[in-house]
Amino acid sequence: MQYKQLGKTDLQVSRLCLGCMTFGEPDRGNHAWTLPEESSRLIIKHAIDGGINFFDTANSYSDGSSEEIVGRAVRDFARREEVVVATKVYHQVGDLPQGLSRPLILRSIDDSLRRLGMDYVDLLQIHRWDYDTPIEETLEALNDVVKAGKARYIGASSMHPHQFEQALRLQKENGWAPFVTMQNHYNLIYREEEQEMLPLCYREGVAVIPWSPLARGRLTRPWGETTARLVSDEFGKTLYSETEENDAKIAERLAFIAEDKGVSRAQVALAWLLSKPGVVAPIIGASREEQLQELIEAVDVTLTREEMAELETPYKAHPVVGFK
């Protein structure tokens, strides 16, 4: 495994972050395809054994059970100081409504720490932009969470570049803890972030940790092949349903290059993303140990300039999606 500094922090993180939305009791939350604790622990242990030290969960994943599972597994399989644990706040969980008001943030971090069984998280991220709360209120509350020692750093996720720029400016002007990461929607078939968000992050020294690096599985298998999760993934359909014809052309080239190199489609798609300036650690998901191992090995795959161009040439502008 390779490691890289997470933006302007002192954290050294693995080049892959294990996304933990897959982990959670299936009868809790909105996803019936999540893995129960016993199966989840096998994946988390394999990740740690494979050198992954960066884990991303959220208060809302499976009604909080993802945090519970991740916390127990990390305590059993690693020392706390050896791992970087990130969680999020915004979406509704239990009787805690959606939002980023000061009371919601302060209660949410306490609930997350209780579920994780930890004194602090390394990274607390706002899951989305809250249009119903003044951003100043949100940013000051996040700063107080950092000052209280409950989160070492804060990050953001999926918002418009002008919103992120405004937040960074307000943090500087008020001496508040800055956003050090941007968790955004970025992969071979969705590259709209290259227009404004990625240059902004690069200029400000903000680490990019993309979600859906494999387009929710679309870049891992023959185009058009379905899975149970793909069929039931209503959010995923909102991301890619309008651009399938163009995306299929990119997937064809991906398959050709993967076959030519003797590696998998997923490994090529991750290698492409890992080569992008500012991208520190794509957030991967896995439901089987062999699947995770395949992704871990992607870190050692390199692409030539010609292969990069071959993958990128068919891309056409997409509707901006993923902010809700």
Which residues does each predicted region cover?
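Beta/alpha (TIM)-barrel catalytic core signal, keyed to glycine-rich beta->alpha loops juxtaposed to Asp/Glu
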Residues: 133-313
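Acidic-and-aromatic substrate-binding clefts and catalytic sites of carbohydrate-active enzymes
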Residues: 58-67, 92-93, 130-134, 161-162, ...
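Active-site groove signature of glycoside hydrolases
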Residues: 114-133
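Conserved beta-strand positions
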Residues: 18, 57, 87, 123-126, ...
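N-terminal binding-site loop/beta-alpha segment at the start of enzyme catalytic domains
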Residues: 1-83
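Acidic (Asp/Glu)-rich catalytic clusters
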Residues: 73-82, 114-117, 146, 168-174
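Active-site mouth loops of central-metabolism enzymes
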Residues: 24-38, 92-103, 132
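Short, acidic/polar
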Residues: 33-47, 100-116, 164-169
